[in-house]
């Protein structure tokens, strides 16, 4: 039986690919869609920010392309099954631009109610570190349940900050896995990414971002126990397949998940499965991308970095 789990990390540390690999594996033709036609979410991605989001777009294609949003806010969705106290708090604050990290007044019961419902409906949750107060409330809620924690850790903070602010411009946060049936969709996203003309990155914003990452790098170290596993970015996203594969096995063994079954790996085989989600083809910020940053030289000089250091997978 799979242990319920939390995937948690700073943004740009690989949480989306890890979540995607588990979601895709756990979905089957029998459980892919709920009775209301909404796609199931074995791993619920960033529920607290999503809870407060509002997307008011009349184009039906927009709704169809947002399965996670539909899971939460669609007809008979996750939001409708939350206790009234949380719905009453959340509904007036929903907005396209809501950021939960800016709302320190979010009460503990919102975190508790979301976790209680998700624990019964989802195998896991993916969350992003959003500050000390946010993490305290999240962990206070999850500690009441039998979760295992997968902490993805990345040390190249400048690379993370640059990747984040580039993605804010072109809005490509992750390449889809290299499924044969996904080829056209995947290529469209890659082309959008390749053809985008980046504007200069704000060095002051990068400074603030790196400072936040530096400050929070030890945020979980004092509370880790046997229910935590720390996964280094350089191992899961290694340039060598064997290290990536063995690291992925370490994760799935920790949560009692069998990736060798054809039901999970969709007859691709476990090695191919890992390559599809963590191979070089999944990297958004590859070395050549840095050359597209108009003020790259100024950034490197300001942070006393070399391009080789920026490209290190650590």
Region annotations inferred by a language model:
Residues 1-110, 174-198, 202, 273, ...:
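PAPS-dependent sulfotransferase catalytic core
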Residues 2, 119-122, 147:
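Short, high-confidence coil segments that cap the C-terminus of an alpha-helix
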Residues 25-26, 225, 293:
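Acidic-histidine catalytic/liganding microenvironments
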Residues 67, 106-113, 137, 160, ...:
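Exposed alpha-helical structural elements
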Residues 124-259:
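PAPS-dependent sulfotransferase catalytic domain
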Residues 105, 109-137:
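Glycine-rich phosphate-binding loop used to anchor ATP phosphates in small-molecule kinases
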């Amino acid at each position: 039986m799979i242990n319920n789990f939390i995937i948690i990390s700073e943004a740009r540390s690989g949480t989306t690919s890890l979540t995607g690999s588990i979601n895709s594996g756990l979905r089957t033709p029998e459980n892919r869609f709920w009775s209301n036609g909404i796609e199931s979410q074995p791993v619920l991605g960033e529920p607290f920010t999503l809870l407060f989001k509002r997307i008011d777009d009349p184009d039906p294609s927009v709704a169809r392309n947002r399965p996670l949003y539909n899971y939460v806010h669609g007809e008979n969705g996750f939001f409708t099954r939350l206790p009234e106290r949380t719905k009453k708090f959340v509904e007036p604050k929903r907005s396209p631009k809501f950021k939960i990290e800016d709302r320190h007044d979010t009460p503990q019961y919102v975190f508790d109610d979301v976790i209680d419902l998700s624990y019964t409906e989802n195998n896991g949750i993916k969350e992003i570190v959003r500050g000390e107060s946010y993490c305290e409330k999240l962990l206070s809620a999850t500690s009441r349940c039998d979760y295992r924690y997968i902490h993805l850790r990345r040390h190249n903070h400048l690379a993370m900050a640059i990747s984040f602010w580039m993605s804010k411009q072109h809005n490509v946060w992750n390449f889809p896995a290299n499924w044969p049936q996904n080829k056209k969709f995947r290529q469209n996203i890659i082309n959008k990414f390749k053809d985008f003309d980046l504007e200069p990155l704000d060095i002051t914003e990068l400074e603030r971002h790196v400072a936040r990452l530096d400050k929070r790098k030890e945020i979980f170290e004092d509370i880790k126990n046997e229910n935590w596993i720390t996964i280094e970015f350089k191992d899961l996203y290694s340039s060598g397949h064997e290290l990536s594969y063995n690291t992925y096995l370490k994760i799935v063994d920790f949560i009692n998940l069998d990736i060798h079954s054809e039901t999970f790996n969709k007859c691709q085989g476990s090695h191919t499965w890992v390559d599809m989600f963590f191979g070089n083809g999944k990297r958004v910020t590859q070395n050549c991308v840095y050359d597209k940053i108009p003020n790259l030289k100024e950034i490197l000089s300001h942070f006393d970095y070399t391009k080789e250091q920026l490209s290190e997978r650590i």
